A protein has these predicted regions:
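The feature captures the ABC ATPase H-loop/switch
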Residues: 108
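Short basic/aromatic active-site micro-motif
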Residues: 168
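N-terminal beta1-alpha1 cap of cysteine-dependent amidohydrolase-like domains
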Residues: 1-104, 112-114, 120, 124-158, ...
Length: 235
């Protein structure tokens, strides 16, 4: 039986929630059945977790800095407290149940915050080292910069090489990494691009958008979703 995969949705202005189709297609093509999980269901996260085999924390708006003990930086973008509340509760539930999680962009940052870590509210203003471009102007399917992978990590095993190229659409990033996560990918300017849990069966976070590269035929991105679905199938 194909595993049922929850994917969190984003909030827009007005009474709408949405999800880019690339997430859905990537899960289907990897062998899973996608189910959208909207904001506003925080009180039912246990029931949701029990119904699902895996969770994708999708990209989107900035996470409220209050959740990691900071005041808002002048350069912080839009925050959506209702989404933050639900996803924090859902992530905790999945971590407690040791069910597979794939955190993408904002989703990786949120995983780190859930476990006690912090993020840069704005890379340009807060990162010490000179930065490469992290908000590319090229198409979403274009891999714009390099990421160096940690040997023997999930991504290193999938890629079978020390470096991959990824797309980039963010102005925030993981800052202080929380236990049980370890850094498994960095860009040339030192920005954390990937992390994985040393405690759980499969919890992986990536700062880029593999669902967009998946659609363009990128093999590493396809393998990310395939190994995620495989772990969701082995519950």
């Amino acid at each position: 039986m194909k595993p049922l995969i929850g994917i969190t949705t984003d909030l827009t202005e007005g009474p709408k929630q949405f999800l880019h189709d690339a997430y859905i297609r990537a899960i289907i093509q990897a062998g899973g059945v996608p189910l959208l999980v909207p904001a506003g269901v925080g009180q039912d996260v246990k029931r949701i977790e029990e119904s699902l085999d895996g969770l994708v924390l999708s990209g989107g708006d900035d996470v409220d800095p209050y959740l990691f003990g900071e005041e808002p930086h002048p350069q912080i973008g839009k925050v959506t407290p209702e989404r933050d509340e639900m996803e924090m509760a859902l992530a905790r539930q999945f971590l407690s149940a040791d069910k597979p999680i794939l955190g993408i962009c904002r989703g990786m940052q949120l995983l780190n915050i859930v476990c006690g870590g912090t993020v840069y509210q704005d890379l340009t203003a807060q990162h010490v080292e000179p930065l490469i471009q992290h908000k590319q102007q090229a198409a979403k399917s274009h891999a714009s910069h390099a990421v160096t992978l940690t040997k023997d990590s999930i991504l290193h095993r999938l890629a079978a090489r020390n470096e991959i190229r990824v797309n980039s659409f963010h102005h925030q990033a993981v800052r202080d990494v929380a236990s049980p996560f370890v850094v498994t990918g960095q860009s040339t300017d030192g920005v954390i691009e990937a992390m994985e849990s040393t405690k759980h069966r499969f919890v992986l976070g990536v700062q880029w958008h593999p669902e967009e590269l998946h659609a363009s035929g990128d093999l590493c991105s396809q393998k990310i979703f395939e190994v995620f679905i495989k772990n969701c199938s082995n519950l």
